[in-house]
UniProtKB/Swiss-Prot annotation:
Residue span(s) of domain TRUD: 154-303
GO MF term list: RNA binding; tRNA pseudouridine(13) synthase activity
GO cellular component, one term: cytosol
SUPFAM superfamilies in alphabetical order: Pseudouridine synthase
Name of this chain's protein: tRNA pseudouridine synthase D
PROSITE patterns: TRUD (PS50984), UPF0024 (PS01268)
Pfam families: TruD
Biological processes per GO annotation: tRNA pseudouridine synthesis
Entry-linked PANTHER family: TRNA PSEUDOURIDINE SYNTHASE D
Length: 349
């Protein structure tokens, strides 16, 4: 599977630029979508961090609170080479709330904390707000045109390269695991590897759909359609194709692609045939998902950034902000704008 083979919705960018020349050029703020309950056995802690990864902070919080590392959870991994505001959840049944003013960790600041009744689980976010700075942008006019297109039409909802590990190593491990060349016993490592494989297969289907149709909004018979912003889906019936196409055009519905696993794909007819053909050479990876009892799921192929705003600090420096639903990647927005030149700071999560 070629991770570099990902099509563009608006054509390959002609402009180039630099992302993450400094951590301050990439700011992420988690949006839980709710306020803490104010009571309960869980303690929600919001921190601002820079220069350290999510698991490192979670382990430090566990040590500070005197609890096992497994009793600290979070909704998602955040890049160490960025400024991020992130929530952690400490399970403290019958325990006194620790004085987090005394918590010290280089690059980390505790912003607030409150009791809550439910554990914070992976993916349990409404979304993330991003503020980015692109530097050394080579063609302001071309980028401006693409910003208008992205505002109106959106971008492919690809998983970003950080999902696959450095140089795609997580996917390579998945392929070796699927071929019975290695065994993976560590639970967290298994999760990363399986996630990388599913994400790569999703990206492949999206890219193939773009190559065939030039669009991610043209409904096929049997497509699995999702209410925009919702997780559940239903199958497009042939008799309803015209009305469903209109709802997709109006951004009420999104066409989905598979996150392969055990269970049905969720599509039928033409859509199912297309997905099976797209992943025809990935039988070993799909079998691995089934063997490891990873539930099949669906994910929207298109995402439209909300509240997309931008300003030019000068002709080569673009400041932009936008909001994406949980699981969508800011780097997938940027790749439709510019060809990113290498910087010294690359994502590791």
């Amino acid at each position: 599977m070629d991770l570099t083979r990902q099509g563009w919705l608006h054509g390959q960018p002609t402009a180039s630029g630099v992302l993450k020349s400094t951590p301050e050029d990439f700011v992420v703020i988690e949006d839980l979508g709710y306020s803490p309950d104010g009571d309960g056995e869980q303690l929600l802690v919001r921190v601002r961090k820079q220069g350290c990864n999510t698991r490192f902070v979670a382990e430090a919080l566990a040590k500070f609170a005197g609890i096992p590392a497994r009793d600290v959870s979070f909704a998602g991994m955040k890049d160490r080479h960025a400024v991020t505001e992130q929530w952690f959840c400490l399970r403290l049944p019958g325990k006194v709330t620790p004085d987090l003013n005394a918590f010290q960790l280089e690059g980390v600041e505790v912003l607030e904390s409150a009791r809550h009744r439910r554990k914070l689980r992976i993916g349990a976010l409404q979304g993330n707000a991003f503020t980015l700075v692109l530097r050394q942008v080579s063609d302001r006019d071309a980028v401006e045109q693409r910003l208008q297109l992205i505002t109106a039409v959106g971008v492919p909802n690809y998983f970003g390269s950080q999902r696959f590990g450095h140089d795609g190593n997580n996917l390579k491990l998945a392929q070796r695991w699927a071929a019975d060349e290695i065994r993976v016993r560590e639970r967290s490592k298994r999760s990363f590897i399986l996630s990388a494989a599913r994400s790569a297969m999703f990206n492949q289907v999206v890219s193939d759909r773009l190559a065939q149709q030039g669009s991610l909004c043209r409904v096929l018979a049997g497509d699995a359609l999702q209410l925009t912003g919702r997780g559940s889906w239903f199958v497009a019936e042939t008799a309803e194709m015209d009305s469903l196409q209109q709802r997709v055009d109006n951004n009420e519905l999104r066409i989905t692609a598979p996150l392969p696993g055990s269970g049905e794909w969720g599509t039928r007819d033409d859509a199912l045939s297309f997905e099976q053909q797209s992943l025809a050479h990935e039988g070993a990876l799909i079998a691995l998902m089934e063997r490891e009892r990873v539930d099949a799921a669906r994910r929207a192929m298109l995402v439209i950034p909300r509240e997309l705003r931008w300003r030019w600090a000068d002709d080569a420096t673009l400041e932009m902000s936008f909001w994406l639903p949980a699981g969508s990647f800011a780097t997938s927005v940027v790749r439709e704008l510019i060809v990113t030149q290498s910087s010294s700071n690359e994502a590791d999560e």
